[in-house]
Amino acid sequence: MTGEQTFLGLSNNALFRIDPRLSGNKLVESQLKQYVSKNDFSAAATTEKGYIAVASNKGDIRLFDRLGINAKTHIPALGEAIMGLDVSADGKWILGTCKTYLLLIDAEQKEGKNVGKLGFEKSFGKDSKPRPRRLGLNPSHVAQMQVEAKSPLSFTPAKFNTGLDAQETSIITSTGPFMITWNLKKILRGIQNPYTIKRYNEEVKADNFRFGSDKSVIVALPNEVNMVAKQTFKKPTRESISTPMRNLKSRSSIVDSRY
């Protein structure tokens, strides 16, 4: 979506930038950060300004303002392995995906000499590192979903809605035949069960919001890709969890889009 010609790469213990326009191995030597120890990096994401968040299978997260230097902030292991990572365009919010829950982290500093700065720009104080919000499903919903899907909970990498000058308002992920969206405002207000679901007959392979909107969701199933309106997601109840969406092509559920 931008004119950027390079992309970020990572291995178990290194972060680097690849520029396809270069000759040879395409590696930008000045933007290589290699660690002696095996950090087991697993996912990365960038902000609009190019700040970089990197997560690992150990569960920790590093925040950089650019490649080739030490991280500005290191957030210690938060639990399970982090399999997916996303950041808001302005860098305020970091979203990590673990197998059975999500982690939402506020990267803006609230106290000390660097108040108002992001953890990408300045290090957090020793005793003021951000505390992540753990986003999980209600245990009763999980129990029924696992029975219906005949498989344990396993989230796909969660994403914010994105767009040019768009404000992040929603989060989407999936597990088995279920898509789940979280409402960011409801999360921050502490509302119980701030998510809605959509059930399919088949496993959801991938999902994301349509670019520039949080009202439409693109869903990839084993044999087709469709776009559905977010308004068709339902509050999690015994009925909405047990009843799959039967016809993807009904006019009530498909967004009329010329693209």
Model-derived regions, located:
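Non-catalytic interaction/regulatory modules that flank or connect domains
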Residues: 166-205, 212-221
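Canonical WD40 repeat/beta-propeller blade segments in eukaryotic WD-repeat proteins
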Residues: 1, 31-45, 79-87, 141-164, ...
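Blade-level signature of beta-propeller repeat domains, shared across WD40, Kelch, NHL, RCC1
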Residues: 102-108, 206-259
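Loop/turn-rich, solvent-exposed surfaces of beta-rich toroidal or solenoidal domains
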Residues: 97-99, 142-186
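Loop/turn residues immediately N-terminal
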Residues: 13-16, 50, 58-62, 92, ...
